[in-house]
Amino acid sequence: MRKIRVAQIGTSQYSHGSEIFRTMATNPAIFEIVGYAMPEGEREKFPHMMGTFAPYREMTVEEILADPTIEAVVVETEEIYLTKYALQVARAGKHMHMEKPGGIDPVAFEELIETVKRNKTVFHLGYMYRYNPCLVDILARVQAGEIGDVISVEAQMSGWRDEQQNRFLSAFPGGMMFYLGCHLIDLVLRIQGTPKAVLPYNKQSGAFATSSKDFSMALFEYEHGLSFVKTTQAERGGFLRRQLVITGTKGKYEVRPLEINVAYPMQKTEYTYCTSEEWNDAGTHVASEPFHRYEDMMLAFAAMVRGEKENPFTYDYEWQLYRTLCACCE
């Protein structure tokens, strides 16, 4: 199996750049890490995170892009810089894994999509639930018609954070919707496709002394029903109430919680499957085996770079997802 020579650009306080880098480092038979760059002052802003990168060579972005032996780049900067560096990687003709959802400029993101599409390079985004084995199985069953025609999807992803992270949300249109709601919108679109209309609600909860929109919902209109996503940073105990409910004409899947930390980054997922028409039927409860949150994601990326696997998330899909996210952030 051919190793992928890879480098990483950036990391961030509230995303998963360090975990992604560690995942590559613990798979040396798959990834040969050439180095990393911290172009937006990450070393000074996040000194506590630098130990993960210390054994490897620090480079400039220009050195990474100019090295013809580096075929793949991981872009993990803070969200507001993602598209800026992703565009540079795309223009250099390199394959790319990028933290979700991209920067806040739709025009720049469209240019990014056009560039990777023209170059036919791998464009792989780090949406958290795409490689959750339970959700992969459930969505395949739903798409195969196991619960009949889908009527609605309800998705929630909340938690409680401190005031500093709440202030961080002010950098984004839609606040929490942009930051975490994107994961949920991805699920809704994969299950039901593009909605006929979107109705966004992005509010300030008042739980923190900030102006950030930390309470977000969006309603999606479909032909035969309504779906919604909800995300807030003002819900204590919200992590274990993160959930996905898929209601169909012949059954229902209720995934709750979406993740349980076992020994981070190891996770478990629990869900209930119900097809009975009896009011008191609790359905069948299933608990997954522990799985690594990032390993399947990065191993899939490597397989795409080697040409062994086709990316199921097309350029056009990523562009439609981003546009829908923007509509939910208004």
Language-model regions, residue ranges each:
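Rossmann-fold dehydrogenase core element
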Residues: 111-129, 149-152
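Contiguous beta-strand/loop segments that form the cofactor/metal-binding neighborhood of enzyme cores
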Residues: 2, 179, 186-261, 288, ...
